[in-house]
Amino acid sequence: MSIVTKALNLVPMVVEQTSRGERAYDIYSRLLKERLIFLVGPIDDHMANVIVAQLLFLEADNPEKDISIYINSPGGVVTAGMAIYDTMQYIKPDVSTICVGQAASMGALLLASGAAGKRYALPNSRVMIHQPLGGFQGQATDIDIHAREILTLRSRLNEILAKHTGQSLETIARDTERDNFKSAVDAQAYGLVDQVLERRPEESIQPS
């Protein structure tokens, strides 16, 4: 790995003073203590496992306190995204979602699936919805099997988006036929988020 690549992958560390002396955390672990989860980059099985584990840990830590997920993702593997989605719906705490940068494809679905009234986007973020992508190669029978699976997934994803946005299934099916980009304001009007945040609310949690 080159020095440049290593530098780009460095995770900032923060140091806290405790009664036992100094303790260092990587920034994401420190923010996890504040019940903040970061879903950043392509969604794959590894990311899904990490996010699911964090959600379950925070539920066990305090089942009554909200969890916030900050999303900046181009999307990714449908089944990995569905693992995160199902866990968000399964656990007891409300899960708030915040789009920073972009929430595309599965990222947009996870953004929309936050707790009602607690889905946010920052002003210059972008949201993109579309149908699942195919591209399987192989024998004709296998291609047919995978084509039917994609249609099944598309139907299920459309149902989820309809549930969380309030749009009809027909509208969702039409609007996801091709890549459909939305500004933060347009995403709010469509029902993908509840509010566009320009400044942090005064009652927001502060690091302890």
Swiss-Prot record:
Give the enzyme's EC designation.
3.4.21.92
Catalytic activity as recorded in UniProt: Hydrolysis of proteins to small peptides in the presence of ATP and magnesium. alpha-casein is the usual test substrate. In the absence of ATP, only oligopeptides shorter than five residues are hydrolyzed (such as succinyl-Leu-Tyr-|-NHMec, and Leu-Tyr-Leu-|-Tyr-Trp, in which cleavage of the -Tyr-|-Leu- and -Tyr-|-Trp bonds also occurs)
Q: What PROSITE patterns does UniProt report for this protein, alphabetically?
A: CLP_PROTEASE_HIS (PS00382), CLP_PROTEASE_SER (PS00381)
Which gene carries the instructions for this protein? clpP
Q: Which family does it belong to?
A: Belongs to the peptidase S14 family.
Coiled coil spans = none
* Pfam families to which the protein is assigned, alphabetical: CLP_protease
- One GO location term (cellular component): cytoplasm
CDD domains referenced in this protein's UniProt entry, alphabetically: S14_ClpP_2
Assembly and interaction partners: Fourteen ClpP subunits assemble into 2 heptameric rings which stack back to back to give a disk-like structure with a central cavity, resembling the structure of eukaryotic proteasomes.
Q: What is this protein called?
A: ATP-dependent Clp protease proteolytic subunit
Where can this protein be found? Cytoplasm
- Whose protein is this, by species? Xanthomonas oryzae pv. oryzae (strain KACC10331 / KXO85)
Q: Which residues form the active site?
A: 105 (nucleophile), 130
